[in-house]
Amino acid sequence: MKAAEIREKFLKFFESKGHTIVRSSSLVPGNDPTLMFTNSGMVQFKDVFLGTDPRPYSRATTAQRSVRAGGKHNDLENVGYTARHHTFFEMLGNFSFGDYFKHDAIKFAWELLTTVYQLPKDKLWVTVYQEDDEAYDIWAKEVGVPTERIIRIGDNKGARYASDNFWTMGDTGPCGPCTEIFYDHGPDVWGGPPGSPEEDGDRYIEIWNLVFMQFNRDAQGNMTRLPKQSVDTGMGLERLAAVLQHVHSNYEIDLFQNLIKAAARVTEISDLTNNSLKVIADHIRACSFLIVDGVIPGNEGRGYVLRRIVRRAIRHGYKLGRKGAFFHKLVADLVAEMGTAYPELKEAEQRVTDVLRQEEERFFETIEHGMSILEAALAEVEAKGGKVLDGELAFKLHDTYGFPLDLTADVCRERGMTVDEPAFDDAMARQREQARAAGKFKATQGLEYSGAKTTFHGYEEIAFDDAKVVALYVDGSAVNEVKAGQDAVVVLDHTPFYAESGGQVGDQGVLANAATRFAVADTLKVQADVIGHHGTLEQGTLKVGDVLRAEIDAQRRARTQRNHSATHLMHKALREVLGAHVQQKGSLVDADKTRFDFAHNAPMTDDEIRRVEQIVNNEILANAPGIVRVMPYDEAVKGGAMALFGEKYGDEVRVLDLGFSRELCGGTHVHRTGDIGLFKIVVEGGVAAGIRRVEAITGDNAVRYVQELDARVNEAAAALKAQPSELTQRIAQVQEQVKSLEKELGALKSKLASSQGDELAQQAVEVAGVYVLAATLDGADAKTLRETVDKLKDKLKSAAIVLAAVEGGKVSLIAGVTPDASKKVKAGELVNFVAQQVGGKGGGRPDMAQAGGTEPANLPGALAGVKGWVEERL
């Protein structure tokens, strides 16, 4: 049974049991800023389990794409060297949100494994938590698993409820026992059952984990039963496929074998068991799907992790003899394997290919040099009998050649060596400002709140008169009262304040009554439907239960709305001008501008920018109304609404039709396109490989920008004594005049240098048959110095010469040596002798070299020492 069929049977089975098939969420979690990547099926349902994200279904099933390659869950080091470690994997899961519990969860799992997948019952073992008699009895008495194949696992991690069979979401909150299902590969494979000393062997392999969210744990460790008990299960598709296909390594399943063969093809390797092929086959999945979900190789956060994975794959290709880009060629093979299950992969095939190719080309420019340095260093360590690579060198590879530490460690491990990581960390700390560490995600949500959700009125109103204070926070802790001068967070039952979301900044404004005034500086979500007003109490005292008038800064909101609505129009225009591959990859909309990141592989031309501006301004002139509708997500997408990167959507979504644009959006917008006024792009540039950024302004900001631009044009025209319409022609004339004058100046400098050269030749001192000259040439540039040295070499026949010039506090140096003397006196060494004394360095050929310096005061002494330096070598 192929992996694709296994996935399909899983989803269809649970659909037949009343579960809703929910699409895989993005690898970039939309609801947990503390998590680098989605690493399990339950991540997208976290808020559902917590009760803050209601869904129209109580049973769900998913095939969730997942990555474990950064932060706490990091399998990168083991990938390619073990049978079951991957950076990317698919987690099959079924979920119950206060619906069925242990009985049905266990029965469903057993039926699927033994009836649908037809696994032999006598090959299946199960574990339960030591105290979970209920699960034990279901397995033994209802399912009929022999008691000798049911193993109780206690607290085996050093604390109460710290067990392989007890799951927790954190130190507090939902938790409960779990039961795991294992497959026995038989006595021919070494290993013992779970809980035994030999459990780490490969005979008994965990294939499914059923978690029962049964309790809530408080800060004191007390357990109370949850009013709604839930189920979260997870089964790795790759592990299950290995069992069903009767192989002992995930890399032997059909999906991986096809990718390994493709990797062998592009690397021209015939041995399909080579571990490097496994690494490459694994990494193309992680890299491709991360790019699909909007992650781009970079130097921090998720982009840094992606870059590490890409470069690790490239390094393994390099190890196999590939000296040029190859990795991106596997995208088509991956699409053939997984494009049907994940249409978004097929749609993004060209973009993924382009991003990977660009990253490869960039890395191959430096990998050979970096690898040669690393190999030489390792050889030196081995020659001395050592086993540890210097951490300073590892940092140099990281900082100069783009080698992540784990890549260097990977190479070391293959040689039986390690890296001095403390020394690496010390070097990193000294350069912390330039090399910011990856993976430090700051949570913007963290206030404990268990009350009712906030009712938002901001789509229709800019003020609400009877808003009641339901919670107050100071320094992250809940309080009952806030005093004047204190910074605080206020939660209201009703508010017109928009909380930062979807790229749009939160509102500012005032909360007030007759005795109290609270200035709101920002508005952020405390939970999905709970809005926090961040600011300072300027007057009076504020208590839970107080009633206030909540009023936003209407002018700021209006400017923000103009920019947000313009963003929708610009997105559509970009797709018309540049192509349908353009997708939003990030945005920031505030009162001053809109900043929009999108997928595109080349800088926009001036003509393309003008066309986008023209399209948007035409839509503004049409003054089309904005129409908002709420509908099911699937219906909205089928109707042509565009879903945006990084956003988390519920099953009911808000669709905005604005002019020719239709997008899913929960933000605030203008009533008609004409309200935007004027649209102008002011910045276009690149932020990462395959990602461009534009910044644009609207309304009064755009008018002011055009007026200032017009004023500068008039000033420039006046300075050149021309009309504004003649400015381009006049600038061209001035440039021609400058070019002509520079040519004349160059000729004069050459003439001056020639005459000075004749005088300098007379200053040369003969040393052992070689004329030595070290002098300063006033007013010369590097070109003039070089020409003068050449003339002096011709004139003196046998010579070692250093000429210097000083301009703007900087020293320029040129050294020249005739062929007969260059065997003993090298121009590069000679120029460095002088350069080191004037605060610089340089290099070049044995007969000609150049350098610079920043300490001209030391130049006379440095030149005076040239004769003695040459004399020592002759």
UniProtKB/Swiss-Prot annotation:
InterPro entries: aa-tRNA-synth_II/BPL/LPL (IPR045864), Ala-tRNA-lgiase_IIc (IPR002318), Ala-tRNA-ligase_IIc_anticod-bd (IPR018162), Ala-tRNA-synth_IIc_core (IPR018165), Ala-tRNA-synth_IIc_N (IPR018164), Ala-tRNA_ligase (IPR050058), Ala_tRNA_ligase_euk/bac (IPR023033), DHHA1_dom (IPR003156). Its cofactor is Zn(2+). GO terms for molecular function: alanine-tRNA ligase activity; aminoacyl-tRNA deacylase activity; ATP binding; tRNA binding; zinc ion binding. Binds 1 zinc ion per subunit. One of its GO terms (cellular component) is cytosol. Zn(2+) binds at residues 564, 568, 665, 669. Consists of three domains; the N-terminal catalytic domain, the editing domain and the C-terminal C-Ala domain. The editing domain removes incorrectly charged amino acids, while the C-Ala domain, along with tRNA(Ala), serves as a bridge to cooperatively bring together the editing and aminoacylation centers thus stimulating deacylation of misacylated tRNAs. Catalyzes the attachment of alanine to tRNA(Ala) in a two-step reaction: alanine is first activated by ATP to form Ala-AMP and then transferred to the acceptor end of tRNA(Ala). Also edits incorrectly charged Ser-tRNA(Ala) and Gly-tRNA(Ala) via its editing domain. This is Alanine--tRNA ligase. It comes from Burkholderia cenocepacia (strain HI2424).
